[in-house]
Amino acid sequence: MEPLNHDCGIVMIRLLKPLSYYQQKYGTWQYPMHKLYLMMEKQKNRGQEGAGIACVKMHAEPGEEYMFRERALGSSAIPEVFNTTYKGYAKNYTREQINDPDFAAVNMPFAGELYMGHLRYSTTGKSGIAYVHPFLRRNNWKAKNLALCGNFSMINNEEVYNELIEKGQHPRRFADSYFLLEHMGHRLDREVERVFGIAELMGKKNREIT
């Protein structure tokens, strides 16, 4: 058996049914958010210094936001993150709108199909909200977006940092999670462009491809 260590906590939930299903079965479309909270609380004893959540809407239309993130620092970071989200609901929407899963799916943040949670335990000595996962890499092309959280500590940061520079990038911070995000993003960009080119040769139109 491996020894017990202080590690980051990670949660991921992928819904296979629409929000209306959870509204009908559990009385609220926010059921996956409640599960996310519970699963993060069960990992709280890992000594986290901060917490963050992210959500992706898989069926958003152009002009609609589809990636959301909330982060906080401190021992009460988990309830703070969720309370901030719920207070936003109460401030910006009516009770009828909040209880309508179809309205929420289109208009409300954190009403999506993919949820991610992270509890940060620092192994590098660096702290601050900028180091709390999930990390986001945003792009107007949906296929090029990334949300990343992990439990790792790279020992070859200088080498990975220099690889990014050699690729022509200009890293904006020195952090292993950021390096990994940009390396993955670089490869994702290349792959999306490769597949896009193949689809164009097959006669498909831009929006049809994406």
Positions of the model-derived regions?
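Conserved short alpha-helical segments that host acidic/polar catalytic motifs at enzyme active sites
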Residues: 1-210
